[in-house]
A protein has these predicted regions:
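Hydrophobic alpha-helical transmembrane segments
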Residues: 50, 54, 94-98, 121-125, ...
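Active-site cofactor/substrate anionic-group-binding motifs, chiefly glycine-
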Residues: 89-123, 132, 156
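N-terminal signal-anchor module of multipass membrane proteins
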Residues: 1-97, 101
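Long hydrophobic alpha-helical segments that form multi-pass transmembrane helix bundles
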Residues: 162-243
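C-terminal ends of transmembrane helices
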Residues: 34-40, 104-116, 152-162, 244-253, ...
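Alpha-helical transmembrane segments
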Residues: 252-298
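Membrane-interface helix-loop-helix junctions at boundaries between adjacent transmembrane segments
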Residues: 118-198
Length: 298
């Protein structure tokens, strides 16, 4: 390797070593291991673990791209094929992903170089999660601001991966929700119409938004709720696709089925408690439906 000597201690590009190390360990298995302290030997490192999580996100991401397209064409009353819907959704989604990774990794590299430590691997997943929990119509400049806020305030001020007390992806969403609520809620932000005319009778409200307005849920749509072809954030509408990702995490040993099951049990029990003294449609919603609505599974 004729390049590495320039980046190691004493080389003319020594300060840029964290950036070099990030690319090297992403492409190749690291040639160094821990030397002291308690540690566990494993066949994969943290970057490979994060890549596995990214693979587990693919079912929800790909379905979300298709769902964005099919809701768009339904809203404007235009016929479509599976590929036409997917292509439209992918073209709308890719700029969000590019901005999330571009802005976030730039900040990560800046902090790593200034502090002289390795680039944290956690953003490989965070960079994908942020656009997946956003409305498809979120302005790109807002996404930039939310990513900057999430990475700096939600992560780097605490020391980086493993030391942050806030979830960076949820921090980005919470920031936009409180700073620009009109762009993060309502019945118009979840479906991209390219400013076209919406057909009569079409509503872009999410099922939970209808329930919050005391509109009973249509029980004939339970199948759609589970499959996910309903309005909502890009990656969180399809419980089916999310469960496919969970299977990948469990099969590879990255995720614990006990942890996942406990979350669903806890959510189900809490929903039953609300059912006991339900005073509105949202609290009266059957407990099992809470598990497939509102991005709970995601």
């Amino acid at each position: 390797n004729t390049v590495k000597p320039h980046f190691i201690k004493g080389g003319k590009l020594e300060r840029m070593y964290p950036a070099y190390d990030a690319f090297e360990t992403f492409l190749f298995v690291p040639d160094h291991t821990t030397q002291k302290g308690s540690h566990i030997r494993d066949a994969i490192d943290l970057k490979r673990t994060m890549i596995t999580v990214l693979i587990a996100l693919m079912p929800a991401l790909l379905f979300g791209m298709w769902n964005v397209g099919q809701l768009h064409f339904i809203a404007i009353g235009e016929s479509f094929t599976l590929m036409k819907a997917f292509t439209y959704g992918a073209l709308k989604m890719l700029p969000l992903i590019a901005i999330s990774y571009g802005v976030g990794l730039s900040i990560e590299f800046t902090f790593a170089i200034s502090r002289g430590h390795s680039v944290n691997e956690g953003y490989l997943v965070t960079g994908m999660l942020i656009p997946m929990i956003m409305p498809i119509d979120v302005p790109l400049w807002m996404l930039v601001v939310s990513v900057i806020f999430a990475v700096i305030i939600g992560k780097e001020v605490f020391g980086g991966t493993g030391m942050n007390i806030l979830n960076p992806a949820l921090t980005a969403r919470a920031f936009l929700f409180f700073a620009y609520p009109s762009f993060m809620s309502g019945d118009k932000v979840w479906i991209n119409t390219d400013n076209g005319t919406v057909v009569n009778g079409f509503s872009g409200a999410t099922p939970l938004a209808d329930l919050a307005a005391n509109i009973p849920v249509d029980m004939s749509l339970i199948g759609s709720f589970f499959l996910g072809n309903i309005p909502g954030s890009i990656g969180e509408t399809s419980t089916f696709a999310i469960l496919l990702g969970a299977v990948i995490l469990i099969f590879t040993g990255i995720g614990s089925w006990r942890t996942m099951l406990s979350v669903f049990i806890g959510g189900y029990i809490m929903s039953l408690l609300f059912n006991l003294w339900g005073i509105n449609e949202l609290m009266l919603l059957p407990a099992h439906l809470h598990l497939i609505l509102g991005g709970f599974a995601f």
